[in-house]
Swiss-Prot record:
It comes from Ricinus communis (Castor bean). Binds 3 Mg(2+) ions per subunit. Does not produce any detectable product when tested in vitro. A motif (DDXXD motif) lies at residues 326-330. Belongs to the terpene synthase family. Probable sesquiterpene synthase. One of its GO terms (biological process) is hydrocarbon biosynthetic process. This is Probable terpene synthase 13. GO terms for molecular function: magnesium ion binding; terpene synthase activity. InterPro entries: Isoprenoid_synthase_dom_sf, Terpene_cyclase-like_1_C, Terpene_cyclase_plant_C1, Terpene_synth_N, Terpene_synth_N_sf, Terpene_synthase-like, Terpene_synthase_metal-bd, Terpenoid_cyclase/PrenylTrfase. Keywords: Lyase, Magnesium, Metal-binding. Its EC number is 4.2.3.-.
Length: 572
C-alpha cells in the first residue's frame, strides 16, 4: 500500500532527523553561533555576542524581491484554485505546515469562508477530503459539526470497516480528531481511537519509510504541534518525494522565508542578550537559572508571526521574571521572607522594598522597572495604561507560589483539585498571556481588560495543560533543589491504594480534556483577536517540548529544534 508524494511531504515534516550539513569555508575570524548560545544549559556567552552580531545572516534587497515575487505568484495560484475543492485545501494544509501562512492569511480566510458556507462541500464521500476540510475549518475557528463523519459509520454505529484500507483517509481522520471540543464531539473521540488502532496495525505491514510517516502522524498531530518547529526538515522530504508543480513553488518560498525569519530571530536574541546583561540579575542572584535563550524560545514559539518582533523581545522579559521569582520561592527564600515579598508585591510598595533582603530587593526593583517599561510602551501605542493589571498578575503569581511554599514548609500535601487550582495560577501562564494581550493591543477596552483579568477559560485551559505536563516531567526537571509537589503525588495520597500509573493516566486524560476546552474557546465567536488565540494555542503546543526531559535532565528535542531554527542554515 503506497502513500502519495504529497502525503510523504505533509506527514514527514514532523520528523526531527539530523540533516547532512553542507561544508563551507569559513573566515578565520568566524565564531560559531553555538559557542555563544549554549543550548545545553540555555545560557549566553556575553563576550561573543557583539562579534557574532556582525556575522548574523543579512539578506539582500534582491532576496526580499524574490520572496515578494514568489508570494505574489502563489497568491495567484491560490486564487485560481480557490473555486476548486480538494486541491486548494491541500495547498492551505501545506502552507500552514510550512509555517508560512502569515503571507496568505487573507486568501486562506476567504477560501475557508467559502468552504464553510457552501453545503455541497459536506457531501464529500472521500474520507481524506472531508476530514481535511473539517480540520482546516475547525483550525480556522469555524464550528463545523462533527456529525459530518456519521456517513462513515455502519448500521451498528461503528466506523465502517471498508475504511480500513484507506491509509491517507485514516491519517487525516486522526488529525481531525485532535480538534474535538468536548462531550458533544464524542464521534471525534471514537474516530481518534478507531484511526489510531488501524494505523498502528498498518505500521507493522509497511516498509520503514512508510511506517515512519504513520508514526509521525500519530506522535505529532499537526494541530498540537508548532508548524515552524516541525518544518525544519522540508528540504529532505521535498527531495525524497520528488515533488513538482505548486509544491515546488512553496518549497522555494518557504526556504527564503525561513532564512528571513531566522535572521530576524537572531537579531532579537542579540537584543535579549544585551538586555539580560544590562539587567545584571544573574550576577546579583547567582542561585537563579541563567537561561535567557530558553526564555526567548518561549516568546519565539508563542508569538510566531514575523511582524511581532518587538513583542517577542518584550515578552521575554516577564517570562524571565517568572523563572527568577520561581527560584526565589523554590530554592532560596525563607517562609518569612517570602511572605513579606508577596505582601510588598501585592501592594506594589516601592518604599517598603528596603525591608526585603538584598536579593529580593534587586528582583523587585528590576521587576518594577520592566513592568513600567512595558506599561509605557502599551500606553504609547494603544492608549491604555496596563500597569495596574500587570501588577495584579504578579501579585497573583506570588500568592500562588507562597501557598505552595507553605504547603512544603508544613509538610502538608493538599487534595489534588486544590493543588491543581493553585497550580493553574503558579504555572505563570496567566502572567504571560495577560502581557501578550496588552502587547498585541487588540481589544484593549474596559470590557476586554476586565475579561482578561478574570482568567477566562482560554487562559485556564492553557495553564492546565502546562501545569499537568510539568507535573508529569517533574522528576526529570533541571534538578532544582526545591520541591513543588505534583498532581500525581497529591492524587496518590488522596486516593489510598492508587498506583502512580493510574494517576499518570488520569493526568493524561485531563490534559486531553483541557485541549478540548482550549479548542472550544478558539472557535468563533470569541472576544479575542486571531493573534491572541493563536498565542494561546502556540503556548500549549510548546509545553511538551519544554517539559520532555531525558534522564540527563536535558531537553534533547527542544535543543535540536533550537539549533535547527536559529543556528543552522538552509541553502537556497
Amino acid at each position: 500500500m503506497a502513500l502519495s508524494s504529497i502525503s510523504i511531504f505533509i506527514h514527514c515534516l514532523v520528523d526531527p532527523l539530523p540533516r547532512k550539513q553542507t561544508s563551507k569555508t569559513l573566515p578565520s575570524n568566524h565564531i560559531d553561533f553555538k559557542s555563544a548560545f549554549n543550548v545545553a544549559n540555555w545560557s549566553i556567552n556575553q563576550t561573543l555576542v557583539s562579534p557574532l552580531s556582525a556575522q548574523c545572516i543579512h539578506l539582500t534587497d534582491e532576496d526580499v524581491r524574490i520572496k515578494e515575487r514568489r508570494t505574489r505568484a502563489f497568491k495567484h495560484i491560490l486564487r485560481k484554485e480557490g473555486e476548486g475543492s480538494h486541491e486548494v485545501l491541500a495547498m492551505i494544509d501545506a502552507i500552514q505546515r510550512l509555517g508560512i501562512d502569515h503571507h496568505f492569511q487573507d486568501e486562506i480566510d476567504e477560501i475557508l469562508q467559502r468552504q464553510y458556507t457552501i453545503p455541497s462541500y459536506y457531501n464529500d464521500n472521500d474520507l481524506h477530503g472531508l476530514a481535511l476540510r473539517f480540520r482546516l475549518l475547525r483550525q480556522g475557528g469555524y464550528n463545523v459539526s462533527a456529525g459530518v463523519f456519521d456517513k462513515f459509520k455502519d448500521k451498528e454505529g461503528n466506523f465502517d470497516q471498508k475504511l480500513s484500507d484507506d491509509i491517507r483517509g485514516l491519517m487525516e481522520l486522526y488529525e481531525a480528531s485532535q480538534l474535538s471540543i468536548g462531550a458533544e464531539d464524542h464521534i471525534l473521540d471514537e474516530a481518534g481511537d478507531y484511526s489510531h488502532q488501524l494505523l498502528s496495525s498498518w505500521m507493522t505491514r509497511l516498509d520503514d519509510s512508510q511506517a515512519r510517516i504513520i508514526k509521525n502522524t500519530l506522535d505529532h498531530p499537526h494541530h498540537k504541534n508548532l508548524a515552524r518547529f516541525r518544518a525544519t526538515n522540508f528540504n529532505r522530504y521535498f527531495h525524497m518525494a520528488n515533488i513538482e508543480g505548486w509544491m515546488n513553488e512553496l518549497q522555494e518560498l518557504a526556504k527564503i522565508d525561513f532564512q528571513m525569519v531566522q535572521s530576524q530571530n537572531q537579531q532579537e536574541i542579540f537584543q535579549v542578550a544585551g538586555w539580560w546583561k544590562d539587567l545584571g540579575i544573574s550576577k546579583e542572584l547567582k542561585f537563579v537559572r541563567n537561561q535567557p535563550l530558553k526564555w526567548y524560545i518561549w516568546s519565539m514559539a508563542t508569538l510566531s508571526d514575523p511582524s511581532l518582533s518587538q513583542q517577542r523581545i518584550d515578552l521575554t522579559k516577564p517570562i524571565s521574571f517568572i523563572y527568577i521569582i520561581d527560584d526565589i520561592f523554590d530554592v532560596q527564600g525563607s517562609l518569612d521572607e517570602l511572605t513579606l515579598f508577596t505582601e510588598i508585591v501585592k501592594r506594589w510598595d516601592v518604599e517598603a522594598v528596603e525591608q526585603l533582603p538584598g536579593y529580593m530587593r534587586a528582583c523587585f526593583k528590576a521587576l518594577d522597572s520592566v513592568t513600567n517599561e512595558i506599561g509605557y510602551k502599551v500606553y504609547k501605542q494603544h492608549g491604555w495604561n496596563p500597569v495596574h493589571s500587570l501588577r495584579e498578575t504578579w501579585a497573583s503569581l506570588c500568592k500562588a507560589f507562597l501557598v505552595e511554599a507553605r504547603w512544603f514548609a508544613s509538610g502538608h500535601l493538599p487534595a489534588a483539585e486544590e493543588y491543581l487550582q493553585n497550580g493553574i495560577v503558579s504555572s505563570g501562564v496567566h502572567v504571560v498571556l495577560v502581557h501578550i494581550f496588552y502587547l498585541l493591543g487588540h481589544g484593549v477596552t474596559r470590557e476586554g481588560v476586565d475579561f482578561i483579568g478574570n482568567r477566562p477559560a482560554i487562559i485556564t485551559s492553557t495553564a492546565t495543560i502546562l501545569r499537568l505536563w510539568d507535573d508529569l516531567g517533574i522528576s526529570k526537571d533541571e534538578n532544582q533543589d526545591g520541591h513543588d509537589g505534583s498532581y500525581v503525588e497529591c492524587y496518590v495520597k488522596e486516593h489510598k491504594g492508587s498506583l502512580v500509573e493510574i494517576a499518570t493516566k488520569k493526568v493524561t486524560v485531563m490534559i486531553s480534556d483541557a485541549w478540548k476546552q482550549l479548542n472550544q474557546e478558539c472557535l468563533h465567536p470569541n472576544p479575542f483577536s486571531p493573534n491572541f488565540t493563536k498565542s494561546c494555542l502556540n503556548l500549549a503546543r510548546m509545553v511538551p517540548l519544554m517539559y520532555s526531559y531525558d534522564d540527563n535532565h536535558r531537553l534533547p528535542v527542544l535543543e535540536y529544534y533550537t539549533k535547527s531554527l536559529l543556528f543552522e542554515s538552509v541553502s537556497i
